[in-house]
Amino acid sequence: MLPLPLIANGKGFIRALENDGALAVYAPLEGGYEGRYQRRLRANGYASISLSARGLGDVEAYLMQVHGVRPAHLGKKNIAQEGAVGPIYFAQPIAGYQLENLPAQSKGLVLWILEGYILSQTEIQDLISLTKRVPKLKVVLEMGGDRVFRWQPLLDCLQAA
């Protein structure tokens, strides 16, 4: 009996991610495939973070720099002191903090970004250039659904659009 493609060891996916740094993936809409490939990445020495593309804003600042965020305005304001925009809170960078604290034997950090189809061409280009500048950072961007789990270099996806 031949092994099913679902039980493959994921070597081609990992090799493509290591070569290109950023991949666009298309997964069946019923789900389950993402978790399998994330588990294979972790088994091969990568740390993994899943996040949504919604609300990323400035990709470089959100992922690699300390950045200011404003909480939702709930109708309360201090008329005498501040405007209605509210205070600024500073958040740690999502990827930068994780990269600094990777174990010594780790191969790198993989950002698995959901709903990547909402990102603009410029934001996708920023992700690609970020993986070129930071070699330990890899990006997997979910770009939509398909009947089978497939991937392509994110740069090819950018050129096709």
From Swiss-Prot:
GO CC term (a single one): plasma membrane-derived thylakoid membrane
Annotated family: Belongs to the complex I NdhN subunit family.
Gene source species: Synechocystis sp. (strain ATCC 27184 / PCC 6803 / Kazusa)
Primary location: membrane
Job of this protein: NDH-1 shuttles electrons from an unknown electron donor, via FMN and iron-sulfur (Fe-S) centers, to quinones in the respiratory and/or the photosynthetic chain. The immediate electron acceptor for the enzyme in this species is believed to be plastoquinone. Couples the redox reaction to proton translocation, and thus conserves the redox energy in a proton gradient. Cyanobacterial NDH-1 also plays a role in inorganic carbon-concentration.
Xref: PANTHER family: NAD(P)H-QUINONE OXIDOREDUCTASE SUBUNIT N, CHLOROPLASTIC
Span of the signal peptide: none
Name of this protein: NAD(P)H-quinone oxidoreductase subunit N
Enzyme's top EC category: translocase
